[in-house]
Amino acid sequence: MAAASSTTATTAILAAVIISLAGAATTVDAKFRAMQWTPAHATFYGDETASETMGGACGYGNLYASGYGTDTAALSTTLFKDGYGCGTCYQMRCVGTASCYRGSPAITVTATNLCPPNWAEDPDRGGGGWCNPPRAHFDLSKPAFMRMADWRAGIVPVMYRRVPCARAGGLRFALQGNPYWLLAYVMNVAGAGDVGDMWVKAGGGGGWVRMSHNWGASYQAFAQLGGQALSFKVTSYTTGQTILAAGVTPASWCFGLTYQARVNFS
């Protein structure tokens, strides 16, 4: 099943340099907890190399470079939520078919792409269209699918639940734009894994500039922010938890690089 893809930001993220700098955290007690098990279906796209999963509608670019690897999924529109579902983590098991591996092993995947609807088909009438609203559906990378079921099945029923994302290190900000426009891709998000709001501040003084959601996991600010160290405030879409990452970049920051904070969600 085909999944949406994007070439925007791929080259920049491939060449990204991760720069770790000091940050300070301010949080509220809003830890994300695993949700209840729910029935759905899963398919896969691409081959064993997972090359077709690179890029994607979240804008993470090369998934090896951005830390997500091949344990990834393209979400149906219902779960993707116009990009606010990017970075969320799901645990699932194949159930109810001989194609499931013995013991029904659980896998955990990160949402990195959109599985678009196919209105010409209806799964209730024996066709495709498994990603059509209001269905919850997962179009997995083939390596992820193969860890829970025989790939020759093509599609299997699953039980899934959303779970906290375990990430090593702090939030990562891949920066693009021009002297008058900053576009930041937020990656390596722990906890709920998603981002619902974001602010940026340049230098030690001045106020916070609220960023608007662009697409996928990216946020933008129309402001001149060059030549000053950048700090970010990030709010989780699901929990409302906010963290402050101070001094994420040096004053000499550059477009095309990725900078890592020392804070992350709980």
Swiss-Prot record:
A GO BP term here is: plant-type cell wall loosening
What is a single Pfam family found in this protein's UniProt entry?
A: DPBB_1
- Name all Expansin-like CBD domain ranges: 180-261
Q: What GO CC terms are in its UniProt record?
A: extracellular region; membrane
Does Secreted show up as a keyword for this record? yes
Residues that span the membrane, as ranges:
none
* Disulfide bond sites: none
The keyword Phosphoprotein appears for this protein: no
InterPro entries given in the database record: Expan_Lol_pI, Expansin, Expansin/allergen_DPBB_dom, Expansin_CBD, Expansin_CBD_sf, RlpA-like_DPBB, RlpA-like_sf
The record's SMART domains line, in alphabetical order, gives:
DPBB_1
Signal peptide (residue range): 1-24
Q: What does this protein do?
A: May cause loosening and extension of plant cell walls by disrupting non-covalent bonding between cellulose microfibrils and matrix glucans. No enzymatic activity has been found. May be required for rapid internodal elongation in deepwater rice during submergence.
UniProt-recorded name of the protein: Putative expansin-A30
Q: Which organism is it from?
A: Oryza sativa subsp. japonica
